């Protein structure tokens, strides 16, 4: 049985690159569960990610910071 991958997508309203990141994830695996976190709702997340979004995170140690493409997303989802 194959595990359904889960990722966290750090985003904010109006972020067109965040939409592209979401599309990349779903292109690699349409069954991926994406937990979207709006960094504008948390001061510490704003401080950490405001210059870097979109950011994809899978588990505590795997993180992709934009720019990334299908190759990087595929590698993240299959590890």
Describe each PLM feature range.
Residues 1-28, 35:
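Local sequence-structure signature of Cys/Sec-based thiol-disulfide redox active-site neighborhoods
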Residues 13, 40-41, 68:
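Short beta->alpha linker loops
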Residues 19-22, 46, 70:
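Conserved strand-to-helix beginnings and helix N-cap segments that scaffold or border functional pockets
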Residues 25-30, 56, 77:
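Alpha-helix C-terminal capping segments
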Residues 31-43:
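Thiol-based oxidoreductase modules, predominantly thioredoxin-like and allied folds used
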Residues 43-50:
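N-terminal beta-loop-helix "entrance" segment that forms/cooperates
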Residues 50-56:
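Structural micro-motif
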Residues 60-79:
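Non-catalytic, surface beta->alpha helical segment in thiol-disulfide oxidoreductase systems
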């Amino acid at each position: 049985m194959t595990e359904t991958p889960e990722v966290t997508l750090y985003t904010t309203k109006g972020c067109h690159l965040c939409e592209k990141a979401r599309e990349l994830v779903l292109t690699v695996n349409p069954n991926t569960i994406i937990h979207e976190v709006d960094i504008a709702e948390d001061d510490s997340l704003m401080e950490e990610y405001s210059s870097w979004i979109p950011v994809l995170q899978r588990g505590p140690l795997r993180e992709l910071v934009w720019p990334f493409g299908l190759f990087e997303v595929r590698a993240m989802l299959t590890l």
